[in-house]
């Protein structure tokens, strides 16, 4: 009886060992495929983008852009300075994000990172301006302190607005206004 119990436990151990080996192999293959997929995904190039995707009821957006209220948005994860970000957006026929209303503010608040937006400090006017020269509405974004003005602004999903050096590197949001 003792011999048959030992044989049974050896058999069960062997089967469980094979199952564990198969699970580990499967996990390794899945992890390899995930890493390979992430490494070969194309990065957005500054060239023209012709492949379109449906954005909302009134617009089609370039691939990798997100449509909302007849505008297209690109949440770009490469770190660039404010000027580099602005220039990249311009090369895509867009501009750094200019938030126009609370609905748009809610839409861009879905991200967890800080992003450059199209706001800078004008020493000439002594105020914060959008990239297009319009004044920043006080009721839309949290008031930005101007004690030690660093000149450019990053925004996060917690409605945090920070002034930082324009030379710092950050993610950024480009916006194409289609209407």
From Swiss-Prot:
Membrane topology of the entry: Single-pass type II membrane protein
One Pfam family cited in the UniProt record for this chain: Lectin_C
Matching Gene3D superfamilies: Mannose-Binding Protein A, subunit A
Disulphide linkage map: 58-70, 61-72, 89-174, 152-166
Cellular compartments annotated: Cell membrane
Annotated transmembrane regions: 11-31
Subunit details: Can form disulfide-bonded heterodimer with NKG2 family members KLRC1 and KLRC2. KLRD1-KLRC1 heterodimer interacts with peptide-bound MHC-E-B2M heterotrimeric complex. KLRD1 plays a prominent role in directly interacting with MHC-E. KLRD1-KLRC1 interacts with much higher affinity with peptide-bound MHC-E-B2M than KLRD1-KLRC2. Interacts with the adapter protein TYROBP/DAP12; this interaction is required for cell surface expression and cell activation.
Name used for this protein in its record: Natural killer cells antigen CD94
């Amino acid at each position: 009886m003792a011999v048959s119990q030992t044989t049974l436990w050896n058999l069960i151990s062997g089967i469980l060992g094979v199952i564990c080996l198969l699970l580990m192999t499967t996990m390794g293959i899945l992890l390899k495929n995930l890493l390979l997929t992430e490494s070969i995904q194309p990065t957005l190039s500054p060239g023209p983008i012709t492949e379109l995707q449906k954005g909302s009821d009134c617009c089609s957006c370039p691939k990798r852009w997100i449509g909302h209220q007849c505008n297209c948005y690109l949440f770009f994860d490469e770190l660039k300075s404010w000027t580099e970000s602005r220039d990249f957006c311009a090369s895509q026929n867009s501009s750094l994000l200019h938030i126009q209303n609370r609905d748009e503010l809610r839409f861009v608040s879905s991200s967890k990172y800080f992003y450059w937006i199209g706001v800078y400090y004008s020493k000439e006017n002594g105020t914060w301006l959008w990239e297009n020269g319009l004044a920043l509405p006080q009721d839309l974004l949290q008031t930005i302190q101007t004690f030690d003005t660093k000149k450019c602004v990053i925004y996060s999903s917690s409605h945090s607005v920070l002034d930082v050096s324009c030379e710092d590197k950050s993610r950024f949001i480009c916006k194409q206004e289609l209407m």
